[in-house]
């Protein structure tokens, strides 16, 4: 699966999308925990970099809740009725509901350095591949157990 390109703000106006690598790095890992795009409503200051609005951030977070297993309760968001941010993406829900999570991250330049920051929609193929791998492992385990 090809990594999506981050859409957002460039640090230098001379940069273009062609200067950027696909989305990679540790920002992807923070999304698994529920930080970043999953909790867009909790970080209004980040909205300017992603070219987003409060309404879009609320929508992103609600969509993330629809495809997540639960919510963190240790960090309630006051302007979101004190709800926690979504955690635990469920690949079955992502594929079944066709709701693709939005991830926040930095934009790495092909020649090195940071080009900007923003958001990227995670490709559905990542989730389909994960489900196929789990299915394959489950079948192998079942055959081994007899």
What are these regions (language model features)?
Residues 1-146:
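Anaerobic metallocofactor- and corrinoid-dependent redox/one-carbon enzyme cores
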